[in-house]
Curated annotation (Swiss-Prot):
Domain Collagen-like: 69-128, 143-502, 506-565
GO terms for MF: extracellular matrix structural constituent conferring tensile strength
Cell compartments where the protein resides: Virion
UniProt function note: May participate in the formation of a layer of cross-linked glycosylated fibrils at the viral surface thus giving it a hairy-like appearance.
Biased composition (Gly residues): 752-765
Protein name according to UniProt: Collagen-like protein 5
Lineage: Viruses, Varidnaviria, Bamfordvirae, Nucleocytoviricota, Megaviricetes
Disulfide cysteine pairs (residue numbers): none
Keyword set, alphabetical order: Collagen, Glycoprotein, Hydroxylation, Repeat, Virion
Length: 812
């Protein structure tokens, strides 16, 4: 397998702690425990009998780990691994002799689909087959619409076009994309798999099917918002003079509400003037019938006055154009007579009639029988407000009549004596059917109608002319998947007829019973070939084609130039990353052993707030040449800690970030060093503490930071197996502590010098700032060591050193 490597380089040296000597370290592999006479410090020994790994230190072989480990519980099945890198290309083989072409075999019976054959080499282009003849087009007879029939029998299969002449079998080509699914023919003898034919023409568009039966009236929709104000109606004829009623105050004309869903039928009021018919909207939900204005309180019936002149009837509004009639819904059951509806919005005041003669006061008439409530007329559109008429003479106050039924609120006239309720006007002529009212709220979607019987399987559409046999084998661009052919002998599905115009939406009645399935529409004539449709759904999987003949073996390539003789070294390469942040790397091909070296981020030197010096930062924990067994392709995950920020006059030094590494089941944590405090601040002048190290072999604690005001000096880092903890940073005028032979940062003890940074396992700590004889600013740490502390000259400490990760790979 080949792997792509990043950040690999040739073997480079790693600075050793001064306390170790690992020059020319070796790895021994043998059976049994090693003898201390064998090898030198720094060597490794693998006992193949027990898989124990030993490391020689101070002349003694020390057991550090067992590579086998106890069998763990069966893990959860992992996700499929990514494809491995492509292997190296083998040498080209010799070209084989080309076999002579065999005779075509007899056509055999169609067998079961075989397994997919191996992809062959691209074969030679086969000869084009003859184009088959186009089959005859079947006639589509339109029958009369009858009752919904059962799904018809499957139509006869149209005649297949002539089969193209079989071309010579070419060498097996690369496996092509699945071709369009052709019409399934009658299963015949297994033929030679032909090449994909040209896409047949799309059938002609079918005739529009007969209109389906009217659905059952849906439930009444909810009352809609009040509709928009309509145009002013034509002036009506002058009616008989009514008795002067008490003239009410002119009310404000209410805004016409938005049309809402259809409300419950109220009591049918007197028929109003027919308003202009509005333009037919798209059939929508029945809007709410315009809300009637608020019902006024019934006033005391005034004395019957003389009948005043009836105001001139407004001109009748022009009848609007009749909208297209929608499909009528089934007439719903007549609803119960509803409560009298609220009084509608006040219409515009009609032209003032001429003043009538004052009549004699009449005797109080008997209360007439209440007339039967007339059918409620269609509510006309609200007319424009007419000019106010002249005030008539006040008639003599008549006897108070019985309270009549509240009529629809008329136009407010001038206040006269309240007259007896006028006779109910004749029912107006029924207005022309307005455009079908907006359909009430759309009823819940009815059960999906049975799928219209699939048009009788149309006569099998003309079979597309058998395409010329394409070049066999060459993998063409994947063709557009054709329209999915009807399975089996079914004729090609005709184009879906264009959607019929939506009829005006009828009033939504109560949800009716599921209607009978509509009659199947006559299959329309085949339309002209349409533009290429969108890619159709994937057709049924075709029969497995015959395995093509394996191509000839390619010619053997020229031998490559002989490479230079390599050195016999097990070293493969080194991976290094010293940029803070997270990353991954992959164990390279051939590697079975590796050494890990890494460091966390060092702590930053402190700040200063007065003339005293400030402490240094602590160093991070480190790992040095930790031995590992690895496998090619293993992913190593890591996070590199950054060095702590330098202190300022108002802020202490920042702590270094932790470095973590995960290699298989092994985890390493290298804690960053602590930041130095702020000089001159009580309780905050201590040096930063060193970071600890945790490996599979245990935890090594870090050194403590120096304590200000004459407290304890900083603690040195500790040495563990392949691990060095960070040393503590020194307080003001104190050197930082050391680790593994690397000293801490130095300070100028004769002045108010800054404390030195702690040392890491790979570098000395940053020196503190000095003032005499010249001012030298505090130094930053490197490779995880701590930064030096400042004096009051700069007041800012050195930054902590960033961490890093390094892996050296070996094949043996």
């Amino acid at each position: 397998m080949n792997y792509q490597y990043t950040n690999y380089c040739c073997q480079s040296n790693i600075t050793l702690p001064n306390s170790l000597t690992c020059t020319n370290a070796k790895i021994y592999v043998d059976v049994g425990r090693p003898n201390n006479c064998l090898g030198n410090d720094g060597d490794l020994y693998l006992d193949t009998n027990t898989n124990n790994l030993y490391y020689k230190i101070d002349g003694v072989w020390t057991l550090v780990s067992n590579l086998r480990g106890a069998s763990g519980a069966q893990g959860v099945k992992g996700d499929p691994g990514s494809n491995g890198s492509k292997g190296t290309k083998g040498e080209k083989g010799d070209k084989g002799d080309k076999g002579s072409k065999g005779d075509n075999g007899e056509k055999g019976e169609k067998g079961d689909a075989g397994l997919n054959g191996l992809d062959g080499s691209k074969g030679d282009k086969g000869d084009d087959g003859s184009k088959g003849s186009k089959g005859n087009k079947g006639d589509a007879i339109k029958g009369e619409k009858g009752d919904k029939g059962e799904i018809g029998d499957k139509g006869d299969k149209g005649e297949d076009g002539l089969k193209g002449v079989k071309g010579d079998v070419g060498d097996k080509g690369d496996k092509g994309d699945k071709g369009d699914l052709g019409l399934k023919g009658v299963k015949g003898d297994k033929g030679i798999t032909g090449d994909k034919g040209d896409k047949g023409e799309i059938g002609e568009k079918g005739n529009k099917g007969d209109k389906g039966d009217v659905g059952v009236k849906g439930d009444d929709g909810t009352k809609g918002e009040k509709g928009e104000k309509g145009t002013k109606g034509d002036k009506g004829n002058k009616g008989d003079k009514g008795e002067d009623g008490l003239k009410g105050e002119n009310g404000d004309i209410g805004d016409k509400g938005d049309k809402g869903s259809k409300g419950e039928d109220g009591l049918k009021g007197d028929k109003g003037d027919i308003g202009d018919k509005g333009d037919k909207g798209s059939k929508g939900e029945d809007g709410l019938k315009g809300s009637k204005g608020d019902k006024g309180e019934i006033g005391n019936k005034g004395d019957k006055g003389d009948k005043g002149d009836i105001g001139i009837k407004g001109d009748k509004g022009d009848i609007g154009d009749k909208g297209d009639k929608g499909d009528p819904g089934l007439k719903g059951e007549k609803g119960e007579k509803g409560d009298k509806g609220d009084i509608g919005d006040k219409g515009e005041t009609g032209s003032k009639g001429s003043k009538g003669d004052k009549g004699d006061k009449g005797d109080k008439g008997d209360v007439g029988d209440k007339g039967s409530k007339g059918d409620k007329g269609d509510i006309g559109e609200k007319g424009d407000k007419g000019s106010k008429g002249d005030k008539g003479d006040k008639g003599d106050k008549g006897d108070k009549g019985d309270l009549g039924d509240k009529g629809d609120k008329g136009d407010k006239g001038e206040t006269g004596e309240k007259g007896s309720k006028g006779d109910k006007g004749d029912k107006g002529d029924k207005g022309e059917t307005g455009s079908k009212g907006d359909v009430g709220l759309k009823g819940s979607k009815g059960d999906k109608g049975d799928k219209g019987i699939k048009g009788d399987v149309g006569d099998k559409g003309d079979i597309g002319i058998t395409g010329d046999k394409g070049d066999k084998g060459v993998k063409g661009d994947k063709g557009d998947i054709g329209l999915k052919g009807d399975k089996g002998d079914k004729g090609t599905k005709g184009d879906k007829g264009s959607k019929g115009d939506n009829g005006s939406k009828g009033e939504t009645g109560a949800k009716g019973d599921k209607g009978d399935k509509g009659d199947k529409g006559i299959k329309g004539d085949t339309g002209t070939k349409g533009v290429k449709g969108d890619k159709g759904s994937k057709g049924d999987k075709g029969d497995l084609g015959d395995t093509g003949i394996k191509g000839d073996k390619g010619e053997k390539g020229d031998p490559g130039i002989k490479g230079e003789a390599g050195t016999n070294s097990p070293f493969i390469g080194t991976f290094i990353d010293n940029v803070p942040g997270s990353g991954t790397t992959i164990v390279p091909f051939g590697a079975i052993f590796a050494y890990l070296s890494a460091a966390g981020g060092g702590g930053g030197g402190g700040g200063i707030s007065d003339g005293n010096g400030s402490p240094g930062g602590g160093a991070a924990g480190t790992v040095y040449l930790y031995p590992l067994t690895v496998t090619s392709g293993l992913v190593v995950n890591y996070t590199i800690g950054s060095g702590g920020t330098a202190g300022t006059p108002v802020a202490a030094g920042g702590a270094g970030g932790n470095t973590t590494i995960t290699i298989g089941t092994l985890n390493f944590t290298l804690n960053g060093g602590g930041g130095g405090g702020i000089g001159g601040t009580v309780g905050a002048i201590n040096g930063g503490a060193g970071g600890s190290v945790t490996t599979p072999l245990g935890t090594t604690p870090g050194g403590s930071g120096g304590v200000g005001n004459g407290g304890p000096l900083p603690g040195n880092g500790q040495v563990g197996l392949f691990a060095f903890s960070g040393a503590g940073g020194g307080q003001a005028r104190t050197n930082g502590a050391s680790t593994g032979g690397f000293p801490g940062g130095q300070t100028d003890s004769n002045t108010f010098g800054g404390g030195g940074g702690g040392a890491s396992g790979f570098a000395k700590g940053g020196d503190g700032e000095q003032e005499i004889p010249t001012t030298i600013p505090a130094q930053s740490g490197t490779l995880g060591s701590g930064g030096g502390g400042p004096t009051d000259v700069s007041a800012s400490g050195g930054r902590g050193g960033d961490g890093f990760v390094r892996l050296d790979y070996y094949s043996a």
